[in-house]
Regions:
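Polytopic alpha-helical membrane proteins, predominantly small-molecule transporters/carriers
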Residues: 1-147
Length: 147
C-alpha cells in the first residue's frame, strides 16, 4: 500500500510544480534561467539521492537495455519540463497549461502501454468513455477556474 502514498506524493509535487515554476520563471525574467534551475534540481534529486540510496554496492550490474530505457524515460521527463517552460514563455499560465498536460498524460500513457502490451481480452468500453471525458474535464477546469 506504500505505492499509494508515493503516488499521492507525486501528484502533490507535480500539482505544485507548474504554479511554482511559472512564478520562478516570471521572477527570473528568463525561461532558460528557470530551466537551468530545474536541471540543477533534477541533478540534486535525481543523481545524489539515488547514489546515496544505492551506496557503493548498488553501482554494479547495470544492464544496457535498462540504462537505455531509464535514460530515455528521464529524457522524456526533462523534455516535458522544457515544453512546460516554453508553454509559459509563449503566454500560457499554469492554471491553463497544467490541466492540459496532466489530462493528456494519462491518456497517452494508457494508449502507449496498450500498444506495448496488448490487452489479452476485450477492452471495457468505459475506457474509451473515460478517454473522451478527459478533454471535457480539462475544458471544464480551464473554463471554470477561479479568476
Amino acid at each position: 500500500m506504500w505505492w499509494v502514498i508515493f503516488a499521492i506524493g507525486a501528484a502533490l509535487s507535480w500539482g505544485f510544480y507548474g504554479p511554482i515554476l511559472g512564478k520562478g520563471q516570471a521572477l527570473l525574467q528568463n525561461p532558460m534561467k528557470a530551466l537551468l534551475c530545474v536541471g540543477a534540481a533534477y541533478f540534486l534529486m535525481g543523481v545524489l539521492v539515488p547514489l546515496g540510496a544505492l551506496g557503493p554496492s548498488g553501482l554494479t550490474k547495470f544492464t544496457q537495455s535498462g540504462v537505455v530505457n531509464a535514460t530515455l524515460g528521464g529524457a522524456l521527463g526533462a523534455l516535458g519540463a522544457i515544453f512546460i517552460i516554453y508553454a509559459f514563455k509563449n503566454g500560457g499560465v499554469p492554471a491553463y497549461v497544467m490541466p492540459l498536460v496532466f489530462g493528456g498524460a494519462p491518456v497517452i500513457n494508457v494508449l502507449y502501454s496498450m500498444w506495448m502490451h496488448p490487452p489479452k481480452g476485450d477492452i471495457n468500453p468505459l475506457l474509451w468513455v473515460g478517454m473522451a471525458l478527459v478533454p471535457v474535464g480539462a475544458g471544464l477546469v480551464l473554463y471554470y477556474k477561479p479568476s
